[in-house]
Swiss-Prot record:
The gene is PPARD. The keyword DNA-binding applies. Residues 1-58 are annotated as: Disordered. One of its GO terms (cellular component) is nucleus. Heterodimer with the retinoid X receptor. Interacts (via domain NR LBD) with CRY1 and CRY2 in a ligand-dependent manner. 'Lys-48'-linked polyubiquitinated; leading to proteasomal degradation. Deubiquitinated and stabilized by OTUD3. Residues 36-55 have a biased composition (Low complexity). A zinc finger (NR C4-type) spans 74-94, 111-133. One of its GO terms (biological process) is fatty acid metabolic process. GO terms for molecular function: DNA-binding transcription repressor activity, RNA polymerase II-specific; linoleic acid binding; lipid binding; nuclear receptor activity; RNA polymerase II cis-regulatory region sequence-specific DNA binding; zinc ion binding. Keywords: Activator, DNA-binding, Metal-binding, Nucleus, Receptor, Transcription, Transcription regulation, Ubl conjugation, Zinc, Zinc-finger. This is Peroxisome proliferator-activated receptor delta. CDD domains: NR_DBD_Ppar, NR_LBD_PPAR.
Length: 441
């Protein structure tokens, strides 16, 4: 959704001031001591007051600024161009988008419309964005021979030849250490790992079998303490079962956002980013990460809830009235395909980190800094997959494609949430989720 004209103008003016400050080498703004987001207080969504925002979760003062002092516009989206990239004047976002698409051989779902690509919506249709890049003359050959700084040329060439002589690369030890750090952060911050979930689902874990929720009666039994006792108490009973299930989903989502925030803060260099960029990365990345991790607790028949003590059947969720019955089914379809890749928790840790540190999110300030962190994560992921899945030759490019699939899944989910907000007048969204969905795509 578009911002009100006055608000948008104020935001742009503030960003321009900060852009100048950064261009002049202004130091990164600092804030107070770090503090984690409190657990979700979820008594009545419609009465929540001053809830913790993404900014509160990060607990760092100040704000960021967009870089770049060029007046030249990006030929692709109209944002400020940062230079002459791959044959045309382009911004950092479109440069990175084109580079990743070519380098990672991504294929986007074909769009029959000719979407207008602008700064505010450039991530909405990746197919039309790439077609515009090509139509404007952005060149594949420019990746190696285009007009760009020598340092960047060397970096790209190194990336393109990453598969050659990996075992003799002096950075291998660093990549291993980096991967281990990310994995440890994952284990520390996420309560439900894939290993734990699959053990419960297959009955191999030394864990009481989950209580199966397959109809209204079993749901209310669960509400009386069989399953939900460890969740926040005080969720008011709603007469309509579909709305009640919807609110339970929000409870889980808000808690997972908290876990993801703590995980992100453990990723090397994340906390060195501008605060504005940290918030932006979380805003756009948390749902992609959530839906990727959701696959761990899903099988074709249903999903685990309440830390593995309950199991809600897929058929029961399908039986809810529309639009609530439409929310989860696309996630099941994605999860079944994603699980076929047979990733383990060490793979997922790096994959989730790569999702969060994505350099083409709308509104990012220091795109090169974010991309540099993601490049490190992707190199670590590729190397880790080669070691962990030596016979899965195309696993890395498949995961890169899954990142694009997740973005489309989240776009559709955000649009559905906005429709529910407008049409279901007696249904409220948690304020933190409202903040995330606002102006997303």
């Amino acid at each position: 959704m578009e911002q009100p004209p006055g608000e948008a103008a104020e935001v742009r003016e503030e960003e321009e001031k900060k852009e100048v400050a950064e261009a002049e080498g202004a130091p990164e703004l600092n804030g107070g001591p770090e503090r984690s987001l409190p657990s979700s207080s979820y008594t009545d969504l419609s009465r929540s007051s001053s809830p913790p925002s993404l900014l509160d979760q990060l607990q760092m003062g100040g704000d960021g600024a967009s870089c770049g002092s060029l007046n030249m516009e990006c030929r692709v989206c109209g944002d400020k161009a940062s230079g002459f990239h791959y044959g045309v004047h382009a911004c950092e976002g479109c440069k990175g988008f084109f580079r990743r698409t070519i380098r990672m051989k991504l294929e986007y779902e074909k769009c029959e419309r000719i979407c207008k690509i602008q700064k505010k919506n450039r991530n909405k249709c990746q197919y039309c964005r790439f077609q515009k890049c090509v139509a404007l003359g952005m060149s594949h050959n420019a990746i190696r021979f285009g007009r760009m700084p020598e340092a960047e040329k060397r970096k790209l060439v190194a990336g393109l030849t990453a598969n050659e002589g990996t075992q003799h690369n002096p950075q291998v030890a660093d990549l291993k250490a980096f991967s281990k750090h990310i994995y440890n952060a994952y284990l520390k911050n996420f309560n439900m790992t894939k290993k734990k979930a699959r053990g419960i689902l297959t009955g191999k874990a030394s864990h009481t079998a989950p209580f199966v929720i397959h109809d209204i009666e079993t749901l209310w039994q669960a509400e009386k303490g069989l399953v939900w006792k460890q969740l926040v108490n005080g969720l008011p009973p709603y007469k309509e079962i579909s709305v009640h299930v919807f609110y339970r989903c929000q409870c889980t989502t808000v808690e997972t956002v908290r876990e993801l925030t703590e995980f992100a803060k453990s990723i090397p260099s994340f906390s060195n980013l501008f605060l504005n960029d940290q918030v932006t990365l979380l805003k756009y990345g948390v749902h992609e990460a959530i839906f990727a991790m959701l696959a761990s607790i899903v099988n074709k028949d249903g999903l685990l809830v309440a830390n593995g003590t309950g199991f809600v059947t897929r058929e029961f969720l399908r039986s809810l009235r529309k639009p609530f019955s439409d929310i989860i089914e696309p996630k099941f379809e994605f999860a079944v395909k994603f699980n076929a890749l047979e990733l383990d928790d060490s793979d997922l840790a790096l994959f989730i980190a790569a999702i969060i540190l994505c350099g083409d999110r709308p509104g990012l300030i220091n795109v090169p800094q974010v991309e540099a962190i993601q490049d490190t994560i992707l190199r670590a992921l590729e190397f880790h997959l080669q070691a962990n899945h030596p016979y899965a030759q195309y696993l890395f490019p498949k995961l890169l494609q899954k990142m694009a699939d997740l973005r489309q899944l989240v776009t559709e989910h955000a649009q559905m949430m906005q429709r529910i907000k407008k049409t279901e007048t007696e249904t409220s969204l948690h304020p933190l989720l409202q903040e995330i969905y606002k102006d997303m795509y």
